[in-house]
């Protein structure tokens, strides 16, 4: 049986991606980084540059720190799992040395189904949706901002800025009736 070089490379890529761990997937999807060291992974996720991962760092790594939609029980499950694997001293602080030892022994962070996030919703929308579907950013024509994600995102903005006001109430602020020429004004009957 003969394999071509292209076939071999293709099967290697498929094999690697099928068995890529959560950390690899996270680094590629969240940070657009294909190659990294365990030390660079650790330092990138040590958000306060303290020299250790705190509970906040772990939850942020998984995108759970500012996520109110995930129940406390699930957040706690993630914390317990990561601390159990990476914190042999039991002080709830994972140092670089502890993390490197965990990785050297073949350790892999568990995939809980969360991609991992580092910023607020705006940053995440910008990073994952705008970069992918709107490469021109704000210079993109309005008619291109029509994906379900766009609509949902801008509806949230409307809710934040306008609250429970009805659309008619919101329009009052945008229309300056004094600037409308008489010939275009409605005449009451």
Swiss-Prot record:
Q: Which residues hold Ca(2+)?
A: 87, 89, 91, 93, 98
Q: Which GO terms describe its molecular function?
A: calcium ion binding
Q: Which residues form the signal peptide?
A: 1-20
Note the superkingdom of the native organism. Eukaryota
GO CC field: endoplasmic reticulum; endoplasmic reticulum lumen; endoplasmic reticulum-Golgi intermediate compartment; Golgi apparatus; Golgi lumen
InterPro entries xref list: EF-hand-dom_pair, EF_Hand_1_Ca_BS, EF_hand_dom, Nucleobindin
The cellular location(s) given in this protein's UniProt record come to: Endoplasmic reticulum lumen; Golgi apparatus lumen
> Which residues does the UniProt record annotate as the domain EF-hand?
74-109
Which keywords label this protein?
Answer: Calcium, Endoplasmic reticulum, Golgi apparatus, Metal-binding, Signal
**Keyword match Calcium:** yes
Record's protein name: Uncharacterized calcium-binding protein C613.03
Source organism per entry reads Schizosaccharomyces pombe (strain 972 / ATCC 24843) (Fission yeast)
